[in-house]
A protein has these predicted regions:
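Catalytic domains of riboflavin
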Residues: 1-202
C-alpha cells in the first residue's frame, strides 16, 4: 500500500520530471529519476492510494523486445500486459529500470545474441563473454517505490530474485502475480533456460 507520510529513503535519487502520459492501455503518470551513475529510471503509475496494495511490475529495459518487437524474448509482451493489467486494476506501477540485457548493457547483449545464434543458451552466452548470467540490482527499484511511499506490493513476476531483491531493501511482497505471456517458437528455448537454469517460475 501507499504510506503517504512515510519518510523518504536515504540517498533518494533526484526527481527530474513527472507528467501525465496517455497510452494505448490508458492514462498513466510517468516519473523520471536519475541515479548516482546518471542513469534515468522511470516509474509509470496510476491510482496509487493509501488503502490498496498496488499491482507492481519491475521491468528491466529491453530495447530489442520493448521497442523493436523482438521474438527472441518475452519482454515486449510482458510490458504491454503489465500496463493493461494495471489499468484494469486501477492501482499500480511499473518500475522501468535502465538495466538492459539483465544488467550487461545493449552492446554486450547483442554480442551474447551472436553466441546464441551459434547454439549457446542465454545463460552460457553471458558466461562465455565473462559476464554474469544476471547482473541486475533491485535496490534501485525499491528506492523508487519507497520514494512514492509504496512499501508493500503485489508483484507481477516469474523471477524469485526480484521478490528477494525487493524484500532485502524494505518492500513487502504481499503476493506474487504470475506473469507469463508472449511465449512463442522463437523464444521457447530462452524461456526454458530461464526456468530450468535460472530458477524462474515458468
Amino acid at each position: 500500500m501507499v504510506v503517504t507520510n512515510r519518510p523518504k529513503p536515504e540517498d533518494v535519487y533526484s526527481v527530474e520530471s513527472d507528467a501525465l502520459l496517455p497510452t494505448e492501455a490508458g492514462n498513466f503518470r510517468v516519473r523520471v529519476t536519475v541515479d548516482d551513475e546518471g542513469k534515468e529510471h522511470s516509474l509509470l503509475y496510476t491510482g496509487l492510494n493509501s488503502t490498496t496494495i498496488p499491482l507492481v511490475r519491475i521491468h528491466s529495459e529491453c530495447l530489442t523486445g520493448d521497442a523493436f518487437g523482438s521474438l527472441k524474448c518475452d519482454c515486449g509482451p510482458q510490458l504491454k500486459h503489465a500496463m493493461d493489467c494495471i489499468q484494469e486494476e486501477g492501482c499500480g506501477a511499473i518500475v522501468y529500470l535502465r538495466q538492459e540485457g539483465r544488467g550487461i548493457g545493449l552492446h554486450a547483449k547483442i554480442k551474447a545474441y551472436a553466441l546464441q545464434d551459434l547454439g549457446l543458451d542465454t545463460l552460457d552466452a553471458n558466461l562465455a563473454l565473462g559476464l554474469p548470467a544476471d547482473g541486475r540490482d533491485y535496490e534501485i527499484a525499491a528506492k523508487l517505490l519507497l520514494e512514492m511511499g509504496i512499501d508493500e506490493v503485489r508483484l507481477m513476476t516469474n523471477n524469485p530474485h526480484k521478490i528477494n531483491g525487493l524484500k532485502r531493501h524494505g518492500i513487502r511482497v504481499h503476493e506474487r502475480v504470475p506473469h507469463i505471456t508472449g511465449v512463442g517458437e522463437k523464444n521457447k528455448h530462452y524461456l526454458e533456460t530461464k526456468g530450468k537454469r535460472m530458477g524462474h517460475l515458468l
